[in-house]
Design a protein with these regions (language model features):
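Acidic, gly/ser/pro-rich intrinsically disordered tails
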Residues: 202-275
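Compact mixed alphabeta submodule
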Residues: 112-234
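Generic N-terminal initiation segments characterized by hydrophobic and/or small/turn-forming residues
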Residues: 7-10, 144, 189, 243, ...
Length: 275
């Protein structure tokens, strides 16, 4: 056993842990039930747009997987779902819909009353995202991220007993008063210069790693096909397409369909698969 290699690995893991947690403090934040106030600060990594959209897969691997599409790379699951839809088979179309990546949005926020903890990443879905975009498009609200003349965002969050679902629901509204991020120049500078980057926070899997997770999900060791996580999400690509055609019952298992679509010996059907 190489003790030097073990020490190097330990140091690497500790460094990664410190980077992700920020000295033991989570870099992520989410609103709790009740009323809170935050300030969305200018995005250090994209000066013109404060929000970062990312694609994730839930329930396919042992952990949530960030899609390679987030880094502009080919995604085997996305290619697979395209082939499923193109087949015109109802079962395939349904499977493709369940396999689709879910969109999550991240915003850099300074939580009022917790400014000393620095900027956090707030993750939310389509409804809150649209509310923020609508506010930005409202001339009476304007740029609420402006350093000196922006607006705090007031949040009201209700729990499952109100929503009737297992999830909380948060509504947003702008403060009527314009204000700076902070009267403390150190807080302002730290908020602008020290921000976690969503793209760097999540593990970047290779094409082959994602493909292996998909194959394991479709053909687990026990012989039974896996189940997709029931992660709540709202699709970002509009209404689902229903104009597929049915050509009889297809008894091919999901695993066999996966093999067929990744088979180098199949006839050329004009698809865009890179393998």
């Amino acid at each position: 056993m190489d003790l030097n290699q073990i020490k190097q690995k330990l140091e690497s893991l500790q460094t990664q842990s410190n980077t992700n947690k920020g000295n033991g403090k989570s870099i992520f934040w989410k609103p709790s039930v009740g009323k809170q106030q935050v300030r969305i600060v200018p995005n250090k990594y994209n000066k013109s747009f404060p929000f970062t959209e990312m694609q994730f897969y839930y329930g396919i691997g042992q952990r949530v997987m960030a899609s390679p599409m987030n880094w502009g790379e080919k995604d085997p699951i996305q290619e697979f779902t395209k082939q499923l839809r193109d087949s015109g088979d109802k079962e395939n179309w349904y499977l493709a819909k369940k396999l689709d990546a879910k969109t999550r949005i991240f915003a850099p926020v300074l939580v009022r009353g917790e400014e000393e903890e620095g900027v956090k990443l707030w993750q939310f879905g389509k409804e809150v995202y649209q509310a923020f975009l609508n506010l930005a498009a409202d001339a009476e609200v304007g740029d609420y991220t402006d350093v000196s003349g922006g607006r705090d965002i007031k949040l009201t969050t209700v729990g499952p007993e109100v929503t009737g679902t297992p999830y909380n629901k948060t509504t947003v509204s702008p403060s009527m008063k314009q204000s700076p991020i902070s009267d403390n120049t150190n807080v302002v500078e730290r908020s602008l210069d020290t921000q976690p980057n969503p793209i760097e926070v999540f593990k970047r899997l290779t094409f082959d790693e994602v493909k292996a997770n998909l194959e394991t999900f479709l053909k687990p060791e026990g012989g039974e096909e896996g189940e997709i996580s029931s992660e709540k999400s709202v699709p970002f690509d509009g209404d689902s397409k229903n104009n597929y055609s049915l050509e009889g019952k297809d008894t091919t298992s999901k695993g066999d369909k996966f093999d067929n679509l990744f088979d180098d010996k199949k006839s050329n059907s004009g698809d865009d698969l890179p393998f």
